[in-house]
């Protein structure tokens, strides 16, 4: 279903966003 597909995409984007945020935080800490 479209709703299930959109939910899957949203979950994937949230997962990727968390990973990117974690990496960005590490870069900021390393830069200090």
Swiss-Prot record:
Main subcellular location: secreted
Superkingdom as given in the UniProt entry: Eukaryota
Keyword annotations of the record: Amidation, Amphibian defense peptide, Antibiotic, Antimicrobial, Cytolysis, Hemolysis, Secreted
GO biological process: defense response to bacterium; killing of cells of another organism
Membrane-spanning ranges: none
Record-listed Glutamine amide modification sites: 32
One Gene Ontology term, aspect cellular component: extracellular region
Compartments where found: Secreted
UniProt keyword annotation of DNA damage present: no
Entry keyword annotation includes Secreted: yes
Tissue-by-tissue expression: Expressed by the skin glands.
Family in the record: Belongs to the frog skin active peptide (FSAP) family. Dermaseptin subfamily.
Function of the protein: Antimicrobial peptide, active against the Gram-positive bacterium S.aureus, and the Gram-negative bacteriun E.coli. Has hemolytic activity at 432 uM.
UniProt-recorded name of the protein: Dermaseptin-8
Species the sequence originates in: Phyllomedusa tarsius (Brownbelly leaf frog)
Source species taxonomy: Eukaryota, Metazoa, Chordata, Craniata, Vertebrata
């Amino acid at each position: 279903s479209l709703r299930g597909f959109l939910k899957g995409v949203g979950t994937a984007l949230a997962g990727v966003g968390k990973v990117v945020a974690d990496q960005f935080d590490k870069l900021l800490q390393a830069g200090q």
